[in-house]
Amino acid sequence: MRSFIAATIAAAASATLMNGEDYAFIQYVAEHAKSYGTVEEFNFRKANFLAAHAEIAAFNSATQTIGHNVFSDWSADEFKKLLGYRAQDRIPSQSTFTPPKSNAAVVDWRSAGAVTPVKDQKACGSCWSFSTTGALEGAHFIASGELLSLSEQQLMDCSWKFGNLSCGGGLMDSAFNYAKTTPITTEAQYPYTAMFHTSCGYVAGTGKVQVSSYYDVTLNSAQALKDAIALGPVSVAIQANEPAFQYYTSGIITSGCGTSLDHGVLAVGYGSENGVEYTIVKNSWGPSWGESGYVRIGVAEGAGICGINSSASQPQTN
C-alpha cells in the first residue's frame, strides 16, 4: 500500500493540471519525507494540511512569521497530546524568590555553554520533563562547569508518586521534588523512548545531578523572570495550542496566544530587536521547528505573552 501511495504522489506531482492546494500538499509531503500507509490516511492528512494551510494564510503579524512544519498534517487532537503541562495540578511552591535586579541588556546561556542541543519529545506529552532537565543541565553547568545531557525518561518513569504521568503530562515543580530525593542520570545511561513505562529503570549510583532546592519566580512579573534568567535557565510554562506557536518559524511572538498554560519549555536568555524585548525559549520539538528549535516570545507585564510569567521555577543543584 505504501508503494501505491508513493505512486499516487508521483503521479500527482507530474500532472500538468493541479490546483494550488494539491500542489502545496505534494510539496509538503516531499519536503518533510512524509509516508502514509493507506488511501484513508493520505486523505486524512491532506485534510489536516489544508486546515493548517488556511490558518497560516490568514495569520498576520508584524513581528513574526509562521509556516508549514512537521505538525501541518496533524489533527488538533494529535497536537494537543504533545502539550503535557498539567496546570490544573500545580500547587505553588512554598519557596518563592525575587532575584536581584539584572542590569544586563542581553543574556544568552547558549553562548555560555550552559544549554544542551535541542531535543525532540516526539508524539508524547513529556514537555515537562524536557523543561526540567534543561533547567537542571543549566544549573549544574553554572555550578560545576560541566554540561551533561540528563535523562527525561528517568523523570517520566520514576516520578509517578510525585504526580507526574509520563506521556500523559506532568509538572516541572513535581519533577524537581522527585530530583530532591533521587539524582538524575544521563541521557546516555537512561535513554529517551517517548513511551509510558510502568516501572522505574533507574540504577542506584548512576545519578549525576540532584536538586538541593528550587523556587517559584514571583508570579506575573516580567522583571522577576528576566532577573531569574540572568542567574540561569528557568523552567516556564506557556500556552502553545495556537497557530502562532504551532507553526512558528521566526521572529518574536507578541500576540496570537493566550494564557491557558499547556506546555513546559525552558527560558535560556533575553534580548531585544528593533525595540521589541523578547525572551529566548528552548522548545523540545527538534531543531527543525522554529528558529533551530527555539522561539522568541515578547515581554509584557502581568501573565505575559503566552502566559510566560505565570509559572516559572528555577532549581539549585548539589
Task: Tell where the protein language model's regions lie, with residue ranges.
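Classical eukaryotic N-terminal signal peptides for Sec-dependent ER targeting/secretion
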Residues: 1-10
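Catalytic-core signature of thiol
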Residues: 4, 14-318
